[in-house]
């Protein structure tokens, strides 16, 4: 059969960042990992998917793909995306409910959607059911350790690049420094620029409540990951005692985790990441659930792919992440009139510049 999976090839790249980027929980980043998976069918057609990490785990993801997932998928019908998604989930469920397993699943699933789009002549935003190919976008800095002057210059760079929304990292050892930095950013950008903050789950519930109350006067759109993402009831306690809406989602890897968050965490925004929640199939499942709860669907990272998904729902915000995967593709993210624009090319709209990234393969 022409759509039978004939071959799957996975590659790992370690791509250096232009400068050290830091947050409150992951520490310093000097590179990110990109794991690509290319699926070839009997008729010779190919689709490429991918996932990424902040610098750790890439070898493990590649190993799970090569030893556990890829051999089991040879001979399967690539058009049966939902069935393959379910198969992968249960094939490796016992050793990985989320985490490395869902990162690996994501790369394969995205490749299958790439094949689907190319076969049907449809871009991802249309395959996802969207009527629109643009969405709101904000720049998310990994800037916790930037001196204040550099932080403010960085924010100015975002605005000069055509964005009207920004997010900064918080979680410094001295909370007053966070408060002062938030105040300085708001004073710099004025009242009309959308402004978010992200603690990378570095605070206790009590600390998060204290900080939120201290900065609510600065018109913060959301407070992201104030505390551990597993502490759904802790999120609810923060929400019950503060005014700034809460956001999370990048550390939720299964539909069950999203379900717990919807039922318990009292979120204002949710941010699934297709690189780690089972690919496009997993992302759409999460997005449908989030939408049922009348919560805007936002994203984390991989803006070159997520622009199509956020545009399809058009309720939330696309994060333009500081890991610039899009700069290693043939079409870096396009921004017009403060909105990100999804590709109209059939497939996922992401084509890697293999010559550019070849030097970083390991």
Swiss-Prot record:
InterPro entries: AHGA_cycloisomerase, Enolase-like_C_sf, Enolase-like_N, Enolase_C-like, Mandelate_racemase_C, Mandelate_racemase_N_dom, RHMD-like
Residues the record marks as active site: 169, 300
Pfam families in the cross-refs: MR_MLE_C, MR_MLE_N
Catalytic activities: 3,6-anhydro-L-galactonate = 2-dehydro-3-deoxy-L-galactonate
Taxonomy, superkingdom: Bacteria
A biological process term (GO) from this entry: galactose catabolic process
Cofactor: Mg(2+)
EC number: 5.5.1.25
Broad class of enzyme this protein falls into: isomerase
Sites where the protein binds Mg(2+): 198, 224, 250
Biotechnology: Could be used for bioconversion of red macroalgal biomass into biofuels or industrial chemicals.
Keywords, in A-Z order: Carbohydrate metabolism, Isomerase, Magnesium, Metal-binding
Entry's Gene Ontology molecular function annotations: hydro-lyase activity; isomerase activity; magnesium ion binding
Family to which this protein belongs: Belongs to the mandelate racemase/muconate lactonizing enzyme family.
Summary of the function given for this chain in its UniProt record: Involved in the degradation of 3,6-anhydro-L-galactose, which is the major monomeric sugar of red macroalgae. Catalyzes the isomerization of 3,6-anhydrogalactonate (AHGA) to 2-keto-3-deoxy-galactonate (KDGal).
UniProt-recorded name of the protein: 3,6-anhydro-alpha-L-galactonate cycloisomerase
Native source species: Vibrio sp. (strain EJY3)
Organism placement in taxonomy: Bacteria, Pseudomonadati, Pseudomonadota, Gammaproteobacteria, Vibrionales
The gene coding this protein: Vejaci
């Amino acid at each position: 059969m022409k759509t039978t999976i004939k071959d799957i090839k996975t590659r790992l790249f370690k791509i250096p960042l232009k400068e050290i980027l830091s947050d409150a929980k992951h520490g310093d980043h000097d590179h990110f990992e990109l794991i690509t998976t290319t699926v070839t069918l009997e008729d010779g057609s190919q689709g490429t998917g991918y996932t990424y990490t902040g610098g750790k785990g890439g070898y493990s993801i590649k190993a799970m793909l090569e030893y556990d997932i890829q051999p089991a998928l040879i001979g399967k019908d690539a058009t049966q995306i939902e069935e393959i998604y379910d198969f992968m989930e249960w094939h490796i469920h016992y050793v990985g409910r989320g985490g490395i397993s869902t990162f690996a699943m994501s790369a394969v699933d995205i490749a299958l959607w790439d094949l689907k789009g190319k076969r049907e002549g449809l871009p991802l935003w249309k395959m996802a059911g969207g009527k629109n190919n643009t969405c709101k976008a904000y720049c998310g800095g990994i800037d916790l350790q930037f001196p204040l002057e550099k932080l403010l210059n960085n924010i100015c760079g975002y605005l000069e690049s055509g964005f009207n929304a920004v997010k900064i990292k918080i979680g410094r050892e001295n909370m007053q420094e966070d408060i002062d930095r938030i105040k300085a950013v708001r004073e710099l950008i004025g009242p009309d620029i959308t402004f978010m903050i992200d603690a990378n789950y570095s605070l206790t519930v009590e600390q998060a409540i204290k900080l939120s109350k201290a900065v609510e006067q600065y018109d913060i759109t959301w407070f992201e990951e104030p505390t551990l993402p597993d502490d759904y009831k802790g999120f609810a306690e923060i929400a019950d005692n503060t005014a700034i809406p809460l956001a999370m989602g990048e550390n939720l890897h299964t539909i069950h985790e999203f379900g717990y968050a919807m039922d318990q965490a009292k979120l204002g925004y949710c941010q699934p990441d297709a690189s780690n929640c089972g690919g496009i199939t997993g992302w759409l499942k999460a997005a449908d659930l989030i939408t049922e709860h009348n919560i805007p669907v936002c994203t984390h990272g991989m803006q070159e792919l997520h622009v199509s998904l956020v545009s399809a729902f058009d309720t939330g915000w696309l994060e333009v992440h500081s890991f610039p995967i899009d700069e290693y593709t043939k079409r870096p993210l396009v921004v017009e009139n403060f909105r990100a624009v999804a590709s109209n090319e059939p497939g996922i709209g992401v084509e890697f510049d293999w010559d550019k990234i070849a030097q970083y393969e390991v």
